[in-house]
Amino acid sequence: YDKYLYICDIIKILNMKIIGKNSFAKYLSYLFLILFIFIAFHVIYEFIGFAITYINLKTNNNFLSETFYVGHSIDWGGKAVTNPNHLFFRFKYPFSDQQMLTGNYTLGTFFNHTIVGIFWSIFLFYGYKISKALSKEDIFSKEIIRFLKTLYISIFVFVPLYIINWVIISKTPFSGSLFFSSFTYIFIAIIAAFTTEFFKKGYKLQSENDLTI
């Protein structure tokens, strides 16, 4: 019996270190927040870059062309590439010569970066919200249930958009890597959905217990 109590105490201590105040969840929320800010900046900056290059192409202007370049020639891996029938783009970081993004200037490229960027921004933002909620004393709440639900719904919406962009817009054959990446996202969504149900049960039991008291 003493050994049983000892094991229970260890589990309780480990549980307190994972969730609750001054726990692993609290510091994990900081990491998610930093990553969210980093990714969100890139998504917004890339969108601005695509907008400026598109306007420059249509109006034949060179507005901020040193930072947001689009043309038929590009320096790719230290080698100059020129194709009069193809457009390339290169985005640099603000006030810097450091390249941020380089590639083929196509609709598929734009949609891919936009869809993936927005998804990861949402994923990291709700990862931050969920971790922050888990760092509180009362982890069974409507708040965390809502965050988890939004997270797995976002993944289920993202996967078909991701596949459509690659197969239909980018005209890339459905490959094994696309299948496994899509399967991984869906698997995470299923885990999040089951976790949501677990927290729903916990919240219901907690509410019933509060009413009894």
Annotate each PLM feature:
Residues 132-156, 206-213:
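Membrane-helix boundary/juxtamembrane motif in polytopic membrane proteins
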Residues 44-72:
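Membrane-helix exit/juxtamembrane interface segments
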Residues 162-170:
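Transmembrane alpha-helical segments of integral membrane proteins
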Residues 87-118:
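Individual transmembrane alpha-helix segments
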